[in-house]
Every structure is written in structure tokens, then in C-alpha cells.
């Protein structure tokens, strides 16, 4: 109830957070409006949205608040799913130290003495990309993809599906299907080395971001974020479990929902490599 939120201070905190986000988005939009971006290479999503707004399209009318809402959706969705992927990824690497050693060796060989991993380094980190594919296969942040609706009557494998049927795609189950994957319950990034399988919507055995025109619009942002952060964690730190703790002690139970978190927090010791 609203009066309870007022008494507890929840309403005022939400309003303060909203105003803070609104100021950030105003600043972001002003920066894009005030600076000239004449070349296509330097245009980003905000530039495209502002161009649509300026063109005054009747098909896609956009207000400033609409653009802010789209930006918020991109960041909010990407932040939660990125954190989930990193949490599961670090857990699997702690449980599988040989995989971590190989991934660390690759990252440190490419990055060298630099303390910061650059986005330009990512294209050379092929084993790290395989690790991330394996993370998404076993632990898709969104276990059930957004619902779809059949446009017409169709028959698939003996099942008659009428038009207007709402259905869900279980990405979690597909990633563990023994008909598609050998040893599906094992964390083995090597399965993707030399393989053309990717998660960009062309291979239906691996669809953590969906497929088709309605696939996740933040796939590039999301994957780049996971790659960059995971590479930095592996490059900058050596990782180990606390004393008297073994990989078998880690609780791999999941909280099923719109996104799939681990029930237990991951507690590890980070040893910095750089002063």
C-alpha cells in the first residue's frame, strides 16, 4: 500500500533513485545531441533513437521519455544477466581448476604485462570464448526464453499446434539435452574449440539469447561485458577457495525464476597479481 511505503521511506528512496537515473539519462542524451557524429562508424543505439525522434516518423513516434526507457531496459536487463553469468562462470572455474589455468594462461599471454584487458584483446581469446559458451549452455541466465505465439496452424513431429498458441522455449533443458550434447552435465569448454556452434540464433542447441527477429537486442553488449569482465578477473587475480573448503562443498542449487541465480553466494579468495 502507498501509505505504508511512505511511512517506511520506500517511496522517497524510489523517487530519489528515479531522479538520479533521470539525470544520468538527460546527461547522456545531451552529450549525444551536442556533439556531431557524422560518420556511421561512430553512431550507437542512442544516436539511432535520436535520429528516429528527429525524423518525426509516424510509424515509430519516440519521445525523450521513450528513449530513456529503452536505455534503462538495456542496462537493467544486461546488468542482472551479466552478473548471473559471471557468478556461474567463476563457480565452474573454481570447480574445474584445469579449465581456469588454461583460460588464465591464454588471457595473460595475450594481454602481457598490461594490467588492463582491452576490448581489442577479446578477438584473440578463443578458449575464453569457449568457456563463456559453456557457461551459457549449462547456466543460461534466462532459463525460459520470452514466450512466442504461433501465427498459423502447424504440425510438428505429430503434434498439432493451432494458431495463437502461446509456448515457451526451455533454454536450460536444451543446453543439457543428451541428444545434442555429449556428457551434457560436464563443464567442458573444449567441446566448442574448433566448433562452429555459436549463440547468435543460428544453432538451436544453444540459444541463451533466443533467435530470430525477437532475439535479445543486447546480445552484443551482454557478451562483450561478460568476456571483458571475466578476462579481467582471470588476468588480474589468482583465485582459490577459503581454507578447509573444497569444490565439492560448493552448493550448485539454483533459484528458478525469470533469471536463474545460485542459491548460495560464491566466497573465494582473490590474490592480486599487480601492485
Task: State each model region's role.
Residues 17, 21, 25, 55-108, ...:
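Central I-helix of cytochrome P450 enzymes
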Residues 97, 219-259:
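Cytochrome P450 heme-binding "Cys pocket" and the immediately downstream C-terminal segment
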Amino acid at each position: 500500500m502507498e501509505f505504508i511505503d511512505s511511512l517506511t521511506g520506500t517511496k522517497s528512496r524510489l523517487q530519489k533513485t528515479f531522479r538520479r537515473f533521470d539525470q544520468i539519462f538527460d546527461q547522456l542524451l545531451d552529450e549525444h545531441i551536442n556533439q556531431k557524429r557524422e560518420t556511421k562508424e561512430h553512431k550507437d543505439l542512442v544516436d539511432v533513437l535520436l535520429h528516429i525522434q528527429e525524423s518525426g516518423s509516424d510509424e515509430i513516434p519516440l519521445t525523450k521519455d521513450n528513449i530513456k526507457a529503452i536505455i534503462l531496459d538495456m542496462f537493467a536487463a544486461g546488468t542482472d544477466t551479466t552478473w548471473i553469468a559471471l557468478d556461474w562462470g567463476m563457480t565452474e572455474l573454481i570447480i574445474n581448476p584445469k579449465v581456469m589455468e588454461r583460460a588464465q594462461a591464454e588471457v595473460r599471454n595475450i594481454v602481457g604485462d598490461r594490467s588492463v584487458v582491452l576490448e581489442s584483446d577479446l578477438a584473440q581469446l578463443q578458449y575464453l570464448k569457449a568457456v563463456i559458451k559453456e557457461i551459457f549452455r549449462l547456466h543460461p541466465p534466462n532459463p525460459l526464453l520470452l514466450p512466442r505465439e504461433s501465427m498459423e496452424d502447424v504440425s510438428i513431429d505429430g503434434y498439432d499446434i493451432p494458431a495463437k498458441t502461446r509456448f515457451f522455449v526451455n533454454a536450460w533443458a536444451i543446453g543439457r539435452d543428451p541428444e545434442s550434447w555429449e556428457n551434457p552435465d560436464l563443464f567442458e569448454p573444449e567441446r566448442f574449440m574448433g566448433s562452429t556452434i555459436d549463440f547468435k540464433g543460428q544453432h538451436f542447441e544453444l540459444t541463451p539469447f533466443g533467435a530470430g527477429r525477437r532475439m535479445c537486442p543486447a546480445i552484443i553488449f551482454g557478451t562483450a561485458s561478460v568476456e571483458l569482465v571475466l578476462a579481467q578477473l582471470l588476468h588480474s587475480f589468482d583465485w582459490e577457495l577459503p581454507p578447509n573448503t573444497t569444490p565439492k562443498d560448493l552448493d550448485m542449487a539454483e533459484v528458478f525464476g525469470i533469471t536463474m541465480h545460485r542459491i548460495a553466494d560464491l566466497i573465494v579468495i582473490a590474490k592480486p597479481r599487480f601492485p
